[in-house]
């Protein structure tokens, strides 16, 4: 598949590859933590919330894209036995709709984007000593 064809994939293909329904497993705990910080300490800043939310989404994208890349053989087997939303990945890679390198590269870009946001939150907004360590733990545990 040519590089121009990769860019012409539909928004639906990219959304399917990103698996947005499964982002709730990261977004809801982040929102709960935000609500707890507001409730217990009366701390809430909308700009920090949206930056943190963007970082969580990028970490989720990183893990899902890495899973698409590293699990293509297993996803192909899983889909041939039984197609499920919860097993076998998005189905984009086993169907051959993208070159195998695309989810790997997009995973790395998402990881770097989350890292940049983490640095901004840690050092620009001075959100505390746990911002980067928690983000790194989340990203690495999902990626590997």
Indicate residue ranges for each PLM-predicted region.
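Short regulatory "switch" loops immediately downstream of catalytic or recognition motifs
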Residues: 35-39, 72-73, 115-124
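Active-site-proximal flexible loops/turns
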Residues: 24-26, 40, 75-78, 106
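Cytosolic, membrane-interface loops and tails of multi-pass inner-membrane proteins
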Residues: 2-11, 70-98
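Intramembrane alpha-helical segments
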Residues: 89-144
